A protein has these predicted regions:
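GHKL/Histidine-kinase-like ATPase module
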Residues: 13-18, 24-31, 41-43
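N-terminal glycine-rich anion-binding loops that anchor highly charged ligand groups
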Residues: 23-36, 67-72
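Glycine/serine-rich phosphate-binding loop and adjoining beta1-alpha1 elements at the start
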Residues: 64-178
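N-terminal cap/recognition module
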Residues: 32-64
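N-terminal Rossmann-fold NAD(P) dinucleotide-binding loop
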Residues: 191
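Hydrophobic Val/Ile/Leu positions in short beta-strands of Rossmann-like dinucleotide-binding domains
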Residues: 182-184
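Glycine-rich Rossmann-fold phosphate-binding loop(s) that bind the pyrophosphate
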Residues: 187-188
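Short, Gly/Pro- and small/polar-rich lid/capping loops
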Residues: 1-20
């Protein structure tokens, strides 16, 4: 079995925090993979199955995603190890935020991920004391509502761009747009 520490290379991670709060029982992980282009950006997973190795790998993925998109962010990822439907999610989120506060938002900017919601991000930002500490907040706190379909719109733009490139390269015969069907697998914002 691969150890999280075997994932270290010249690109990162720069910081790895494993935190535990004896008052709540909260166990969490924060991996700040690379901040060469800006603070590490990545969601907070809240699930019983979270492992340090998973968070290492997801943080690296965020490094490459932000770099590929030309964003002024590096990569990072957070994880809280518990079923959010069983534990007191508010106290656990507050505890996680409190323990990683020194890194937010200068080195880490959180977001929603598996098991976290807009309300979790509101709790996180309030506990950090800085609304810039995360994205994915409710609209009342300056967030963009999911109902606007920003993620789905991004998928649509990416698909249209890919089709235009294929057409320009004359790689394949493309049917008329009205004859085209697309299948997207997944759940949540994208699916």
């Amino acid at each position: 079995m691969t150890s999280a520490w075997e994932e270290i290379d010249e690109w990162g991670p720069e910081k790895v925090l494993q935190v535990y709060d004896p008052d709540t029982g909260m166990k969490g992980v924060l991996v700040i993979d690379n901040t060469s282009t800006g603070p590490g950006k990545g969601g907070i997973r809240f699930a019983q199955s979270v492992t340090p190795l998973e968070i290492f790998r997801l943080a690296r993925t965020m490094t490459w995603k932000c770099a590929a998109a030309g964003l002024p962010f590096g990569g990072a990822k957070g994880g809280i190890i518990a079923d959010p439907n069983i534990v007191d999610r508010v106290s656990w989120m507050k505890s996680f935020a409190k323990m990683i506060r020194p890194y937010c938002p200068s080195q880490y900017i959180a977001a929603t991920d598996v098991g976290t919601t807009e309300l979790d991000m509101a709790i996180f930002a309030h506990e950090i004391g800085d609304m810039r500490a995360c994205t994915g907040k409710p609209s009342e706190l300056g967030g963009i509502p999911h109902e606007l379909g920003t993620t789905g719109y991004g998928v649509s733009v990416a698909l249209q761009t890919a089709l235009n490139i294929l057409k320009e390269l004359k790689i394949t015969h493309l049917p008329q747009r009205t004859q085209t069907r697309v299948v997207i697998q997944g759940f949540g914002n994208v699916g």
